[in-house]
Amino acid sequence: MKVYTILLPVYNDWKNLDKLLSKISYIAKKNNFKFYILVVNDCSKFKPKTNLKKNKNIIKFKILNLSQNMGSQRAIALAINHLKKNSDYKNKDIIIMDADGQDDPSTITDLIKMNITKVSDAIVVERTNRREPFWFKFLYLVHKNVLFLFTGNQIRFGNFSLLKFKKIKNLMHKSDIWAAYPAAIVNNLNKISRIKSERKRRYSGNSKVNLYKLFNHSSRVFSVFKYKIFIFSIFY
C-alpha cells in the first residue's frame, strides 16, 4: 500500500486537531491506508498537544514548529519545502487539509481512490456548501467573479487537496505558493482533477473569517495572476 503524507497547518486549534487526527486514524485503519502526518504549528500561543499515537497505519507523526506566525498559506509553503528537502517524505504524495474539522476527513478516501485511477498533477476538493455569514458569501462571490473576469480562472477550492510529490518543484520554483496555495495550483499545474465535498462545521469554536482576512486572501490570489491581469489590462 502506497504511503501518503498528510499536512495539517494549525494555529491554536489543538482541540479540533486532536479530534481530526482521531478520525484520520480511524479512516486509515478502516481502509488500511498508510500515513505520515506532518502538523505545522504556526507559532501557536498554546503549547502543542495531541493524543495521537503512532501505529501500523500512522507510521510517522511530527510537529514542525515555526518560530513566528506566518499565516496558513506561508505555513503550507514552508511545510511543502520541508517535505521536499527531507528524504523521509520522498515520493510520498501529499494530502493537505485544514485542522478545524471543516474539511471532511472521509473525503480522504475519495482523494486516494482517484489518485490511483486517474493521472493528475493534483486533485482538489471543491466545496459544495459554505457555512459562513451572508456578507462573506456575497463578497467571496464578488471576488471569484472578478478573478474570472480578469484571468479566466475559477478557484472553487481551498487548501484541501492531494498534491503529487513529483510536482512540488513546479510549485516551489516560483513565489506563487508563498502567496496563495490554491492559486499556485491553478497557475502552475496542468492536470488538475476535482472532486466535490460538503464543507462541514468546525468541531468547536467560532469561525475566524473577517473582512480583513477576506481582503488579504483576495489580494494574495490576485498577486499570483498579476501578469495575466497586466496583459488583460493592456488589450482590453
Where are these regions (language model features)?
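A conserved acidic beta->alpha catalytic loop
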Residues: N41-T50, G101-Q102
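Short, acidic, metal-binding catalytic loop of nucleotide-sugar glycosyltransferases
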Residues: S22-K34
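Short beta-strand/loop segment that forms part of the nucleotide-sugar
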Residues: F33-S44, L64-L66
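Short acidic donor-binding loop at the edge of a beta-strand
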Residues: N86-D93
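Hydrophobic helical membrane-anchoring modules
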Residues: V3-Y4, K15-K23, N55, A183-Y236
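Acceptor/aglycone-binding surface of glycosyltransferases and processive sugar-polymer synthases
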Residues: L66-Q68, S72-L83, I96, Q102-A179, ...
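Donor nucleotide-sugar binding loop of glycosyltransferases
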Residues: D13-N16, S44, D104
